[in-house]
Amino acid sequence: MLEKETINFEKTIIVGIVTQNQSEEKLKEYLDELEFLTFTAGGEVVKRFSQKMERPNPKTFLGTGKIEEINLYVLENGISTIVFDDELTPSQQKNISKIIDCKILDRTHLILDIFAQRAETSYARTQVELAQCIYLLPRLSGMWTHLERQKGGIGMRGPGETEIETDRRIVRDRIALLKEKIKIIDKQQATQRGNRGAMVRVALVGYTNVGKSTLMNAVGKSDVFVENKLFATLDTTVRKVVIKNLPFLLSDTVGFIRKLPTQLVDSFKSTLDEVREADLLLHVVDISHQDFEDHIDAVNKILLDIKSADKPTIMVFNKIDAYKHLTIDADDLMTERTSKHYTLQEWKNTWMNKVGEQNALFISATNKENFEEFRKKVYETVREIHITRFPYNKFLYPDYEDAIDKEEEQDQD
């Protein structure tokens, strides 16, 4: 599980619903993630609210009684922000704001806000601003009037903060301008990718906060920002990496997440092009997270959406040093054994059977456990792709064993 440091941030409550399609257990998983998203954005979750419903209320998302209960809690406890786990319609957000006098955000808005904080380059900031404008355009009529007296804080950051006004025409013009700006930069990025020469391209993909940047640093000996927060990496980092005299390009891409806003998928076209144009994907998984299989499914869904699901892929199960599983007492005859009771070896057997023994690696990027095995597998796969793609390349690569012998001789000297 993700560990949080104690900081006095905005007092926030988070809200979700249990439906026929979303069990209480699944809601808890989503709210755990939403709480960490809130922490990453600068909020401290002090209370959770949930309600069982067949479907969301089209007017206020929750039932009238639950809305009143939340409103009373907000008034009595000085809550500044409410975050709903599902995306609210513009009318739902407007109706809730009429009843509860605080910032009303949803999961999409929160993720956009985090991206706004994390954007370092001009290009990333432009992408985020476009996503924010597209999201906020249908919500302008009620949202900004209600929030104008609540300056700053969660949900109010980013490049688009000062530009967004209640005039829809101005925002539409801004969207058109940003799209044109991104189109120009995309062409430049495509040209740059085309000029990288005859080298195999490898992309690190995976759920957010699974250790991709740590792995990037360990493999590429580069200095990529690493932090135990969601979306610590936003701008794509590309490094030339050499393993055993074999050079290739390694890119560390933005982490995926469940319920990833479509606005971000559309806006971050060039970032995702690093994945689309890769010859090999290293799908990094935090096996110590209790929901890691759901995370794999979420990543695979996005890879399918961007037409990259059929690329050669190595599953890299990271953080094996932190893996823990549930146990059942010997005299407990009632508890049913599930995948949450699997040992690490059982997971190894499961995934090696599922994707092939050579395509499932179990490592710890932090303490370098099984790291040489990982480097060897990457080397062998990249070398095979290189020989296939560039059969007439004059640069000859030694066999792996020869390279090891040569490296050992150099070390002895």
UniProtKB/Swiss-Prot annotation:
Residues binding GTP are: 206-213, 231-235, 252-255, 318-321, 364-366
Q: Which residues bind Mg(2+)?
A: S213, T233
Q: Which cofactor does it need?
A: Mg(2+)
MF terms per GO, please? GTP binding; GTPase activity; metal ion binding; ribosome binding
- Domain named Hflx-type G is located at 200-386
What the entry lists under InterPro entries is as follows: G_HFLX_dom (IPR030394), GTP-bd (IPR006073), GTP-bd_M (IPR032305), GTPase_HflX (IPR016496), GTPase_HflX_N (IPR025121), GTPase_HflX_N_sf (IPR042108), P-loop_NTPase (IPR027417)
Q: Which family does it belong to?
A: Belongs to the TRAFAC class OBG-HflX-like GTPase superfamily. HflX GTPase family.
**NCBIfam families documented for this protein:** GTP_HflX
- Record protein name field: GTPase HflX
